[in-house]
Amino acid sequence: MKKAILGKKLGMTQIFNENGKVIPVTVIEAGPCTVIQKKTVEKDGYEAIQVAFGDIREKLRNKPVKGHFAKAGVSVKRHIKEFKLEDSNSLEIGQEIKADVFEAGERVDISGVSKGKGFQGTIRRWNAHRGPMSHGSKFHRAVGSMGASSDPSRTFKNKRMPGHMGNVNTTVLNLEVVKIIPEKNLILIKGGVPGPNKGLVQIRNTVKA
């Protein structure tokens, strides 16, 4: 990938474009992310940069992590993430990556952990059809058939059944960057992005370019 940054989802709002059309946008506080380590082919077998994002009290980190930040000469941060960038050699340890690495009109992929929905049935979790709600029906929101009986005498793996919904890594592709506000480290993305407000997200160049 060419560019990547960590950010915090702040919420959604709407703005007007030059034609007066309303655009729903998600506001993301992107960076600043500090480079704390550079991985090299000679030493690590691959090239990448390790970045840190988000302030945190130092006493909430253990000694190995504190030492890792001290070696880089950077204050302790909340999140650490590796990115494989094409021009990682141009970045130095201690250098900051800010929201202005992206420009309005660019297309990006955004990853985050989706909102947890708890234990849900098949209708909400898998969008299954429900049964008739009247005329003597004894089947409304039940699972329905789970397979044949005597043969194979079991329920197959990956059968769509009730269970925990949400709280999984999710990526939305090819979203448009509507506006950059560099003085506040804000990126406005058209549409919704995964996760709750204040959730961690990764922004990078789209793979569909």
UniProtKB/Swiss-Prot annotation:
GO terms, molecular function: rRNA binding; structural constituent of ribosome
One annotated GO biological process: translation
PROSITE patterns to which the protein is assigned, alphabetical: RIBOSOMAL_L3
Source taxon at top rank: Bacteria
Keyword Ribonucleoprotein belongs to the record: yes
Self-association state and partner proteins as the record states: Part of the 50S ribosomal subunit. Forms a cluster with proteins L14 and L19.
Protein name: Large ribosomal subunit protein uL3
Organism: Clostridium botulinum (strain Okra / Type B1)
Organism classification: Bacteria, Bacillati, Bacillota, Clostridia, Eubacteriales
